[in-house]
């Protein structure tokens, strides 16, 4: 007897590469229509996240390739490092300005991350608090009966 193909079974490596390549291809198309400049890789990450959350793409369809890419992420930064070395002339013209921009942007990023985390924690605690309050009220009502 032939075994039926299980939906939870991880897809073959080549199939996973095709899924990720298609997401990147679609994100490149979206990038060309965007009114503001945004990297296709960022659009692709958001698109893949939405596809995974909606169930249009199963985790098994991209997990193996995603893990492989994450494990070898250092290799993906080599071109960026080379372009920084090639731009040393530009960097040497205004080093203090660049260092200042890096410091200010890092501080702004930390502040924004902190505020977003606080908002998420408040929303999460309220929703959990409502569930606990409802459960206690139900238990009290059952105890009085």
Curated annotation (Swiss-Prot):
<keyword id="KW-1003">Cell membrane</keyword>
<dbReference type="InterPro" id="IPR005538">
    <property type="entry name" value="LrgA/CidA"/>
</dbReference>
<dbReference type="GO" id="GO:0005886">
    <property type="term" value="C:plasma membrane"/>
</dbReference>
<feature type="transmembrane region" description="Helical">
    <location>
        <begin position="72"/>
        <end position="92"/>
    </location>
</feature>
<dbReference type="Pfam" id="PF03788">
    <property type="entry name" value="LrgA"/>
</dbReference>
<feature type="transmembrane region" description="Helical">
    <location>
        <begin position="10"/>
        <end position="30"/>
    </location>
</feature>
<feature type="transmembrane region" description="Helical">
    <location>
        <begin position="33"/>
        <end position="53"/>
    </location>
</feature>
<dbReference type="InterPro" id="IPR023736">
    <property type="entry name" value="Antiholin-like_LrgA"/>
</dbReference>
<comment type="similarity">
    <text>Belongs to the CidA/LrgA family. LrgA subfamily.</text>
</comment>
<dbReference type="GO" id="GO:0012501">
    <property type="term" value="P:programmed cell death"/>
</dbReference>
<dbReference type="GO" id="GO:0019835">
    <property type="term" value="P:cytolysis"/>
</dbReference>
<keyword id="KW-1133">Transmembrane helix</keyword>
<keyword id="KW-0472">Membrane</keyword>
<dbReference type="GO" id="GO:0031640">
    <property type="term" value="P:killing of cells of another organism"/>
</dbReference>
<feature type="transmembrane region" description="Helical">
    <location>
        <begin position="96"/>
        <end position="116"/>
    </location>
</feature>
<comment type="function">
    <text>Inhibits the expression or activity of extracellular murein hydrolases by interacting, possibly with LrgB, with the holin-like proteins CidA and/or CidB. The LrgAB and CidAB proteins may affect the proton motive force of the membrane. May be involved in programmed cell death (PCD), possibly triggering PCD in response to antibiotics and environmental stresses.</text>
</comment>
<protein>
    <recommendedName>
        <fullName>Antiholin-like protein LrgA</fullName>
    </recommendedName>
</protein>
<keyword id="KW-0812">Transmembrane</keyword>
<keyword id="KW-0204">Cytolysis</keyword>
